[in-house]
Amino acid sequence: MADSGRRKRPRVGLALSGGAARAFAHLGVLRVLEAHIIPIDCIAGTSAGAIVGALLAAGVPVARIEDISRNLRWRDVGRMTLSRLGVQSNAPLEDWLRKHLPFTRFEDLPIPFAAVAADLHAGTPVTLSGTGDVPFAVRASCALPGWYIPVADKHGRQLVDGGLVANVPAAAARFLGADIVIAVDVNAEGAKFLGTPRTAFGVLLQSLMVVTRTVSGYQWQDADIIIQPKIGHIRWDELGRNDELRAAGEAAARHCLADIERLLASATQA
């Protein structure tokens, strides 16, 4: 017989937005959640948020994710291609993930995880989870259209960056069974301090940011807590500012910590 006095803890999901280099801010958020023993029962990630989410779901400690991210360069995630569908292939990202993930199958992950991509033809989100190859799914979620070639899945779909349709994957976290969703949106401030991008890659990144900001507001409704690091002054391509981004993530998470703890306490059922 079940103990009638036992209190049931709500299932907590984490939704990590895309944002290229800005995703380093997720690491600061994770550091605060870990320090305050906030439980994470499932994780959904889009684009660069899927990279961080996959590592965390595979059991890689936050400190280790920070260490390996310090050495990450654009050449680690893409290489030039002769394809007419893109300037580069992001197949190297798949190789990088296989090097750092202790588990590469969804069904083996210690924490349930979903990577969100976009179906290029249908214009709809594709939630990759449950079974299958994690590095492939994350690669698809990160395939910035126009720069990286689309990633074809076994169903014949052409998959591209999930930020086009679900940059804040709170709905995917609900799909994984979350009762409470903590979302981290690293693009909430947009690029209010930035001028015109100086490279073609920068133009594509900033164009995607415009699109994601438009749709992100609609996706917030699926989240209970929205953490918004103040990083509007940092471009998506500035990998060298990872320490600053992590610090901003920490500050934003601390700002929301009391609300998170209050929500967890009130949602716990007798």
What is the meaning of each model-derived region?
Residues 1-46, 54-270:
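Patatin-like phospholipase
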